[in-house]
Each structure stands twice: as structure tokens, then as C-alpha cells.
């Protein structure tokens, strides 16, 4: 379901069948699902984006040359990321320019195999950053709110292991700033429903847009426990055209979700 829920063509088919689609519009899914388009949209909305460059070339030789040139402008260390990526697929960290060509070719191959799209972009690798995600809700009446953050910095192979709310290092001022940025991100694509805006929080205190998940996520109960908001219920109300029933953000208590991973030895 997670894969289908973020496919714009699936949402379109559901709507064309005369059914109610519980989620954002196909247009919003498409804009946020393509990472390069999302970065460009966020820049236009005034949401801070990780320094980097998008490369639209699809021809392999031209793309690799464009990526090579972009790497000199972005600087090292850097991340190569698939525009249609997720779950760490098509992602490579590069610390030495001598390793760039091999990493870029490998990232493209993996992206094509996983997503059928070999487009790669470059981001500056922000070492020591925390991974913070903001839960948002938006109804069809024009109201968009955030429900605070979840910290998911502890990861294994680019997959989250711990989800914690509220974030242990978060301040009220930073929560408000990140929350307002998440709301701006949602409004930039006319978002409706439940979604998650992910940010990197640098050691300097600066934060940068990473991506938006255009669906409810498995970690949503963490937020429900500390806010008292039933996100699934709100999502269904929104899909029916009703206004959200939740009031101002009030955090109470602490919640942690832990994922178990089964791996080959």
C-alpha cells in the first residue's frame, strides 16, 4: 500500500473510477514524488533546501559529465541521490573526487533498476546532522497545521530504526520555525490530507528540506500519542470534505517507536 499510495497514476485511476481518494491530489503526489521537482518547488516557496544541483540529463554519458561538473561546484563530501528514489536506493556518499565516476555510474544503474528512472542529483553531505520530520495535516477548507516533530536520526542502511516524539534536542522556537516551513511546503503544492515533511537539522541549527512523504506513515502513532490527535480519523474527515477537528498543538508526554529488521547474517 505504501508504494501505491505515492503513485500519482494510481490516485488518478481511483478518482476516475468515481471513488474517494484519501490523500493529496495526483498533482501534489507527482510534484513531491520527483525529488528534483520537489527541491525546485521548495526553493520557489522560500523553504530552505540542502545546497546542491539538479541534473536533468537522461543520456548516460551526458548525465555523468553534467554530474561531474556539478560536483566541483557543490563540493565534497557530497551525496548522489536518485530523483525518483526512496529507501536508500540510488544513493551514494562520495568523500573523494577520485571515487565520483564509479559512484555516479553505480547510483544511476541502481536507480534505473529500482525506479525505471536514472536521473541523479547532488546534495552537499551535511555530516553530524539530525533527521527531523514534521507531521502535517491539511483540509479542503484551507486550513493547514503541523503536529510537531519526530526525530529519526538513528538509521540502518538509510532505513529508520527509532522514531521519537518530541525530539530530545528540539526547542519551542525551532519547532515553530520548522513547523511553519513544513506548512509552507504543503501549501506550495496545494496539499490535502496527512503528510510528512522531512528536514535535516545541521549542527549549526540551520535546517533544510529533504523530502515530503505524501501519505500517512507507519510511525504516525508516535505523534498521535503525544498530541492526542487521531491522524487516521482526521484523514478520513478531510477526504469527506469536513474540516479538521483538532485544535492548537499541545504536546504531552514522550513516545518512541522501534522497528525490528530481519537481515541475512
Regions found by a protein language model. Give the residues of each.
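Peripheral (often C-terminal) accessory segments that flank ATP-dependent C-N-forming ligase machineries
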Residues: 65-67, 234-265
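N-terminal beta-alpha lobe that positions the nucleotide/phosphoryl donor
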Residues: 1-197, 201-220
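ATP-dependent carboxylate-activation loops
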Residues: 217-230
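Hydrophobic residues in alpha-helical segments
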Residues: 126, 226, 238-239
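Generic alpha-helical structural context detector
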Residues: 12, 149, 224, 233-237
Amino acid at each position: 500500500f505504501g508504494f501505491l499510495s505515492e503513485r500519482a497514476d494510481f490516485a488518478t485511476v481511483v478518482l476516475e473510477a468515481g471513488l474517494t481518494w484519501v490523500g493529496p491530489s495526483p498533482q501534489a503526489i507527482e510534484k513531491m514524488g520527483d525529488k528534483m521537482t520537489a527541491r525546485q518547488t521548495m526553493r520557489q516557496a522560500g523553504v530552505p533546501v540542502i545546497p546542491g544541483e539538479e541534473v536533468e540529463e537522461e543520456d548516460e554519458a551526458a548525465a555523468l559529465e553534467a554530474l561531474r561538473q556539478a560536483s566541483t561546484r557543490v563540493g565534497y563530501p557530497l551525496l548522489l541521490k536518485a530523483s525518483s528514489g526512496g529507501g536508500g536506493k540510488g544513493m551514494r556518499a562520495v568523500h573523494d573526487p577520485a571515487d565520483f565516476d564509479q559512484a555516479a555510474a553505480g547510483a544511476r544503474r541502481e536507480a534505473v533498476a529500482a525506479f525505471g528512472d536514472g536521473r541523479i542529483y547532488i546534495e552537499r553531505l551535511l555530516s553530524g546532522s539530525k533527521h527531523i520530520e514534521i507531521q502535517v495535516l491539511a483540509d479542503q477548507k484551507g486550513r493547514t497545521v503541523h503536529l510537531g516533530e519526530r526525530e529519526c536520526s538513528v538509521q540502518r542502511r538509510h532505513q529508520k530504526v527509532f522514531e521519537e516524539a518530541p525530539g530530545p534536542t528540539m526547542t519551542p522556537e525551532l519547532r515553530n520555525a520548522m513547523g511553519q516551513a513544513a506548512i509552507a511546503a504543503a501549501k506550495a503544492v496545494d496539499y490535502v490530507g496527512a503528510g510528512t515533511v522531512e528536514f535535516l537539522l545541521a549542527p549549526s541549527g540551520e535546517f533544510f528540506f529533504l523530502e515530503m512523504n505524501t501519505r500517512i506513515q507507519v510511525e504516525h502513532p508516535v505523534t498521535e500519542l503525544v498530541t492526542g490527535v487521531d491522524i487516521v480519523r482526521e484523514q478520513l474527515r478531510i477526504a469527506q470534505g469536513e474540516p479538521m477537528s483538532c485544535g492548537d498543538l499541545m504536546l504531552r508526554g514522550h513516545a518512541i517507536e522501534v522497528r525490528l529488521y530481519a537481515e541475512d547474517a
